[in-house]
Regions:
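An exposed, glycine/acidic-rich loop-and-rim segment of catalytic or binding clefts
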Residues: 31-376
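Intrinsically disordered, low-complexity regions enriched for glutamine and histidine
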Residues: 11-14, 29, 199
Length: 376
């Protein structure tokens, strides 16, 4: 009899759990405005590269490129269905455009033109990636789709949305070229001074998504300095040299080579989750090399060029195998990395950092290029 009661209790608990999960999923879907207008768009070039983008969150859902033997693989982590992006309990920002301010703002507040603005705190005491409903969780308008070649999306972030001042009109354009370059252009205007720091949050695994860790990938960062953080991952304001530290990627090395060192910054980030100060040889607004990644098994190489002054290198420290991606593949600890071109975290509160303030009458322009090739 006790066994029957336990079985019934377990069955009841399971039913309640399923009902709760179903309610969460339906609630999450119900919160998405214009759900029926969400579509998937394909860019494809003459060199065999394919990129798929959805207008939900301006998310890059897949990037398919050949290896040294011509074998194709999807190297972008993500999901098969848009519902999975919407319903994910853990929000990893797979493939999304994040903003109005990508990265963190300390204590969820900043002062601009004598007025203090309070933002939604969604990362402990701090504000992260634009808040609870940032650009990654809204349906973007499709302005133009040139079949197979380019996709231009727009979104109007209204005054006080997630606490930010000003109506911000944002455009993001994805263009795939025949030399296997994915060009991402950002444009923004505002009717009131506001911080803007928009970036792309794709997780890469050049072996193929779901194919183990990225610790063997060899990374070069064109940066002799980085911005160390406190325990809340807010920059301290210093910009020390990387020489002699695990953060020195000025020459290519395996991501996993120094990640286990006893270093306070690695402890705070649970690995690499920091902003590097890019060496900018040209004028502001000019494209310069930011990073190069080589995966030895496949021979795939990715280069990133950007007009931005910084780049956030995050190596999937919070992935733990619970998230199931495309075709049900688990994404293991450090199973993907992000290279987010950006202005520095918490710039609105740190005046010696490059400014992120956009004013009426100005246009914010930024470009990042992800270029793929094969090495023998």
């Amino acid at each position: 009899m006790q066994s029957i009661r336990r079985t019934r209790s377990l069955f009841t608990l399971c039913c309640r759990l399923v009902a709760c999960m179903t309610l969460f999923a339906s609630t999450a879907l119900a919160q998405v405005k214009d759900f029926d207008s969400i579509k998937l768009y394909t860019l494809k070039n003459e060199s065999g590269m394919t990129v798929r983008v959805t207008n939900y969150g301006a998310i890059i859902s897949s990037i398919i490129v050949p290896d040294r033997n011509g074998k194709q693989a999807d190297i972008a982590l993500g999901y098969d269905r848009v519902e999975d992006y919407i319903n994910a309990v853990d929000k990893p920002y797979f493939g999304a455009v994040v903003g109005r301010y990508g990265n963190r703002i300390a204590k969820g507040k900043f002062t601009l033109d004598g007025e203090t603005y309070s933002l939604l705190k969604n990362n402990g005491e701090n504000h992260l990636h634009g808040g609870a409903i940032g650009f990654d969780k809204v349906v973007w308008t499709v302005d133009e789709y040139v079949e197979g070649k380019s996709l231009t999306l727009s979104y109007l972030a209204k005054d006080k949305e997630e606490g930010y001042p000003g109506n911000l009109q944002l455009k993001v354009a994805y263009t795939l070229t025949d030399d296997n370059s994915l060009v991402v252009d950002y444009y923004a205007t505002t009717d009131k001074a506001t911080p803007v720091n928009v970036t792309q949050h794709t997780y890469f695994n050049l072996k193929g998504e779901g194919q183990g860790t990225i610790l063997d990938h060899e990374l070069m960062l064109n940066a002799k300095k980085f911005t160390p953080v406190d325990e809340g991952l807010i920059p301290t304001g210093d910009m020390p040299d990387v020489a002699g530290t695990p953060f020195d990627f000025t020459s290519a090395k395996a991501i996993g080579r120094d990640i286990g060192q006893q270093h306070e910054q690695l402890k705070f980030g649970l690995g690499f989750d920091h902003n590097w100060v890019l060496d900018k040889a040209g004028k502001d607004g000019e494209l310069t090399l930011a990073a190069r990644v080589y995966e030895p098994t496949s021979g795939r190489v990715m280069e990133i060029h950007t007009t931005e002054p910084g780049i956030q290198f995050y190596c999937g420290n919070f992935l733990d195998g619970r998230l199931k991606g495309k075709s049900g593949k688990p994404y293991v600890h450090r199973g993907g990395f992000c290279l987010e071109t950006q202005h520095y975290p918490d710039s609105p509160n740190q005046t010696h950092f490059p400014s992120t303030i956009l004013k009426p009458g100005e246009e914010h322009q930024s470009q990042t290029v992800f270029k793929f090739r094969r090495s023998n």
